[in-house]
Swiss-Prot record:
This is ADP/ATP translocase 1. The modification N6,N6,N6-trimethyllysine is found at residue 52. GO terms for biological process: adaptive thermogenesis; ADP transport; apoptotic mitochondrial changes; heart development; liver development; mitochondrial ADP transmembrane transport; mitochondrial ATP transmembrane transport; negative regulation of cardiac muscle cell apoptotic process. The transmembrane helices are not perpendicular to the plane of the membrane, but cross the membrane at an angle. Odd-numbered transmembrane helices exhibit a sharp kink, due to the presence of a conserved proline residue. A motif (Nucleotide carrier signature motif) lies at residues 235-240. The gene is Slc25a4. Under cell death induction, transglutaminated by TGM2. Transglutamination leads to formation of covalent cross-links between a glutamine and the epsilon-amino group of a lysine residue, forming polymers. It comes from Rattus norvegicus (Rat).
Length: 298
């Protein structure tokens, strides 16, 4: 195996392991975030039963659906997240070679910064093409609030993918893809671009204390998450459309979704669950730091 292939494999493994561990840890926060985002577009949650906020959601989920339901959709998320994050990190370094070849970070700061933004955005968009149906299934499973199997819309990952494919075809599994690409480019550009740039400007980037790395990563994930959050809300709402027919369809397209959310719910609706997203971002920051630590040993 060549050095480049070995390096690619190390990136893939380190990124995937770090992601699987952190996503399982923050799965309850992730589910709260998703429910707050999509409840307005859910057929299962009537207006009077909608969650009032993060605390209300955290209290009601175990009472109404059982404690383990906090991890509903987590298996799909881990399966999805392993290749997503691993491919992001692996492709990021490949794109860095393309965008940053021959660039001196100290003498050409803005070109270095722009190159990091481009490599991060391109890495996220590329990996999204491969794993979007899993991301779709994770969202629909997490949004399923039925208590028992008889009340639930889907009985698992395979059932979700099969039902939507039979109903809407491949298009149904890629509902909201275009706005996802827009959001992922903005998020990943900040996530990788600012993180790498900040670390690169330190005196000794390869020997940064883990606390410093975590603080940088925490700031980056919080900012990136808030900036791209409205795109995430719209894509989740579009995902909720798949499997619906006729009068049940809420949005005719992405633009209509943006317009109706702003008009009917107000601009604040684009940021529903955003605070839980900041908390979840601690897991994202942990991924970046853990990835760097794992790479030292593989």
């Amino acid at each position: 195996m060549g050095d480049q292939a070995l390096s690619f494999l190390k990136d893939f493994l380190a990124g995937g392991i770090a992601a699987a561990v952190s996503k399982t840890a923050v799965a309850p926060i992730e589910r709260v975030k998703l429910l707050l985002q999509v409840q307005h577009a859910s057929k299962q949650i009537s207006a009077e039963k909608q969650y009032k906020g993060i605390i209300d959601c955290v209290v009601r989920i175990p009472k109404e659906q059982g404690f383990l339901s906090f991890w509903r959709g987590n298996l799909a998320n881990v399966i999805r997240y392993f290749p997503t994050q691993a491919l992001n990190f692996a492709f990021k370094d490949k794109y860095k070679q393309i965008f940053l070849g021959g660039v001196d970070r100290h003498k050409q700061f803005w070109r270095y910064f722009a190159g990091n933004l481009a490599s991060g955005g391109a890495a996220g968009a590329t990996s999204l093409c491969f794993v979007y149906p899993l991301d779709f299934a994770r969202t629909r499973l997490a949004a399923d609030v039925g208590k028992g199997s008889s009340q639930r819309e889907f009985n698992g990952l395979g059932d979700c993918l099969t039902k939507i494919f039979k109903s809407d075809g491949l298009k149904g599994l890629y509902q909201g893809f275009s706005v996802s690409v827009q959001g992922i480019i903005i998020y990943r550009a900040a996530y990788f671009g600012v993180y790498d740039t900040a670390k690169g400007m330190l005196p000794d980037p390869k020997n940064v204390h883990i606390i410093v790395s975590w603080m940088i990563a925490q700031s980056v994930t919080a900012v990136a998450g808030l900036v791209s959050y409205p795109f995430d809300t719209v894509r989740r709402r579009m995902m909720m459309q798949s499997g619906r027919k006729g009068a049940d369809i809420m949005y005719t397209g992405t633009v209509d979704c943006w317009r109706k959310i702003a008009k009917d719910e107000g601009r604040k609706a684009f940021f529903k669950g955003a605070w839980s997203n900041v908390l979840r971002g601690m897991g994202g920051a942990f991924v970046l730091v853990l990835y760097d630590e794992i790479k030292k040993y593989v």
